[in-house]
């Protein structure tokens, strides 16, 4: 009995399943939320009822899958709104409220998808109907238009209809759209012509009403001419305005046009501290380096300045310190740059082509009138005459980047004056603040002085040590200063001539000494014996010889006895006398005898230089 009952229950479920499924499909998945509830209730039943429900469920699932092959949503989700067994197991673990919410969301998503499909089908039908209507209107327009088709209208109409039917059948959507646009343009032109005709008629009627209909041909001609001129002026005025707008708003397409708004590094340095720097620079173009190319040269690009910002680091620009950086744009990219990387060279054609391509791609190409305006701004900024207020602002701007003042004395004097004024006003707090600033300036000055003398501190220490050592030796008596009586060739001497005055005997002695060098005799004593006892003449005679006028004009050799000491070498032969000619000079013994001789010897020797001279 149990088997028969189960079989009968299976048959009943099979009969009921198609009816319920058909009614459910008409109502867009109406009973589907009931299915998981039935499964939930079946899960809560006894174990005896479970084996009876499983085969019926499998059969209903297969039937529903076969019926649901037409819809695109049922490919991934089955009738129970589950993708696979894991999804179903996950759903079973949820609470009742979460289960209902999950089922509702899945049903809503399926309904939305079905609604989208229906809307898409309706739109496709409407597009098809509109295309058919467009074809019919074209046929009617061609059939109504006369002219050259009057010869054989039936044949041409039939051939046109056949070709139009074929074109309508094989015509894609873009061709149909072009035809629609063309028809719309023709309709607009016809409407404009009709409006112009109506306006002309209305103007003519108004003139007739004012001046009368029988005013003559002149009035009619003048009215027609006025209407024509007014209509022509109306037609020409917007064209002229548009042409002017086109000329004014012409885009930059040449390198010469872009060069008008170019800024170099030198121009930027001229107005870096000016109060109008930001407004002048924004909108101009600069040439910036982008590193090395594959070859030997550097890579440069053209950038547009879109803003000015301040950075934390201070750098130098043409000898001027600043912390300003420029925000530049090239196509769709923006980057901040220091102005020290801006090139002084002009733009090149390759760089301009790259910049033009990037601007066209991103749609930010400038116009010629903007270039002219920026050129005027640059010239105005460079040739600007600064007022006292602007100069004060520039000085403040420069002082921001100076950590140490240049002129310590001047700054200290200014602070001292302000301190005195504060004390006179009785503002003790301000006077104390100024005093701290003065102390800071003095400290900075001392540090700079130490840095300057740091390189020469070692040499200064050595010099100071040597001076102190010599001073101690002189004071203690260890060091004695000896005066050298002999002439030192390395000491400086006075080169000026001095007038020598003295007795006649001294002058005669000097003359005899000078004449003895010229008159040299052949005889003499032994050279070795004469050189053994050299005597040095007194310093007074040497001074007289040098200062004597006659000795200055003597071209003969002046024997220096001090130097003969060094070159003297005693000979081995005892009594051999050298054979000296009279032209080479006399021996030392003869020279001594003549020096020690009386007035007769002096007079005899003094005759020689007079004859020689």
From Swiss-Prot:
Low complexity bias: start-end ranges: 215-235, 510-521, 602-613
Composition bias, Basic residues: 55-68
Ranges of Polar residues composition bias in the record: 569-586
Gene Ontology BP terms: transcription elongation by RNA polymerase II
PROSITE patterns referenced in this protein's UniProt entry, alphabetically: PLUS3 (PS51360)
Knockout or disruption consequences: RNAi-mediated knock-down is mostly embryonic lethal. Embryogenesis proceeds more slowly, with embryos displaying defects in the positioning and shape of epidermal cells.
Chief location of this protein within or outside the cell: nucleus
Signal peptide coordinates: none
Highest taxon of source: Eukaryota
Domain Plus3 intervals: 252-383
Region entry Disordered, spans: 1-90, 121-247, 485-549, 564-613
Biased composition (Basic and acidic residues): 167-176, 236-247
Biased segments, Acidic residues type: 72-81
Coiled coil location: 175-209, 425-462
GO CC field: Cdc73/Paf1 complex; nucleus
Keywords from the UniProt entry: Coiled coil, Nucleus, Transcription, Transcription regulation
GO molecular function (one): DNA binding
Subcellular location(s) per record: Nucleus
Assembly and oligomerization: Component of the PAF1 complex which consists of at least cdc-73, ctr-9, leo-1, pafo-1 and rtfo-1.
Function: Component of the PAF1 complex which is a multifunctional complex involved in transcription initiation via genetic interactions with TATA-binding proteins, elongation and transcription-coupled histone modification.
UniProt protein name: RNA polymerase-associated protein RTF1 homolog
């Amino acid at each position: 009995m149990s088997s028969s009952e189960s079989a009968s229950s299976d048959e009943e479920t099979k009969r009921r399943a198609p009816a319920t499924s058909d009614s459910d499909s008409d109502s867009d998945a109406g009973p589907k939320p009931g299915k998981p509830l039935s499964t939930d209730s079946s899960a809560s039943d006894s174990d005896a009822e479970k084996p009876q429900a499983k085969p019926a469920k499998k059969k209903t699932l297969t039937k529903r899958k076969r019926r649901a092959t037409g819809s695109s949503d049922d490919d991934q989700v089955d009738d129970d709104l589950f993708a696979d067994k894991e999804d179903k197991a996950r759903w079973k673990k949820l609470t009742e409220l979460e289960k209902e919410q999950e089922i509702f969301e899945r049903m809503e998503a399926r309904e939305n998808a079905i609604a989208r499909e229906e809307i898409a089908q309706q739109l496709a039908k409407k597009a098809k109907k509109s295309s058919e209507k467009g074809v019919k209107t074209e046929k009617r327009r061609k059939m109504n238009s006369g002219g050259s088709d009057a010869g054989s209208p039936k044949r041409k109409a039939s051939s046109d209809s056949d070709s139009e039917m074929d074109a309508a059948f094989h015509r894609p959507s873009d061709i149909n759209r072009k035809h629609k646009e063309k028809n719309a343009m023709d309709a607009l032109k016809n409407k404009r012509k009709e409006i112009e005709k109506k306006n002309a008629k209305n103007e003519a009627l108004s003139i007739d009403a004012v001046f009368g209909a029988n005013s003559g041909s002149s009035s009619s001609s003048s009215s027609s001419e006025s209407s024509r001129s007014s209509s022509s002026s109306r037609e020409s005025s917007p064209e002229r305005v548009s042409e002017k707008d086109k000329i004014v708003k012409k885009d930059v397409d040449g390198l010469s046009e872009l060069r008008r708004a170019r800024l170099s590094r030198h121009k930027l340095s001229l107005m870096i501290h000016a109060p109008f720097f930001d407004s002048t620079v924004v909108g101009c173009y600069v040439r910036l380096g982008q590193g090395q190319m594959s070859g030997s040269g550097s890579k440069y690009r053209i950038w547009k300045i879109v803003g000015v910002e301040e950075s934390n680091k201070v750098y130098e620009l043409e000898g001027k310190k600043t912390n300003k950086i420029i925000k530049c744009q090239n196509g769709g990219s923006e980057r901040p740059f220091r102005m020290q990387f801006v090139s002084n060279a002009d733009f090149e054609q390759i760089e301009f082509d790259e910049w033009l391509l990037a601007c066209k791609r991103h749609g930010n190409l400038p116009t010629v009138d903007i270039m002219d305006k920026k050129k005027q701004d640059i010239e105005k900024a460079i040739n600007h005459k600064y007022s006292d207020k602007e100069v004060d602002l520039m000085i403040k701007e420069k002082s921001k980047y100076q950590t140490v003042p240049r002129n310590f004395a001047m700054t200290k004097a200014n602070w001292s004056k302000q301190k005195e004024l504060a004390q006179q006003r009785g503002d003790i707090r301000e006077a104390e603040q100024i005093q701290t600033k003065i102390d800071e300036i003095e400290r900075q000055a001392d540090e700079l002085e130490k840095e300057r003398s740091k390189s020469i501190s070692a040499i200064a220490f050595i010099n100071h040590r040597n001076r102190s050592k010599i001073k101690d030796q002189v004071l203690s008596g260890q060091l004695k200063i000896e005066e050298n009586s002999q002439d030192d060739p390395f000491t400086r001497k006075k080169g000026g001539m001095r007038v020598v005055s003295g007795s006649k005997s001294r002058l005669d002695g000097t003359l005899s000494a000078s004449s003895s060098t010229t008159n040299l005799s052949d005889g003499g004593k032994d050279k070795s014996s004469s050189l053994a006892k050299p005597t040095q003449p007194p310093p007074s005679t040497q001074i007289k010889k040098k200062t004597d006028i006659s000795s200055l004009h003597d071209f003969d050799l002046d024997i220096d006895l001090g130097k003969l000491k060094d070159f003297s070498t005693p000979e081995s032969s005892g009594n051999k006398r050298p054979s000296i000619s009279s032209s080479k000079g006399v021996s030392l013994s003869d020279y001594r005898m003549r020096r020690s001789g009386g007035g007769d010897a002096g007079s005899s020797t003094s005759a020689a230089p007079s004859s020689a001279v």
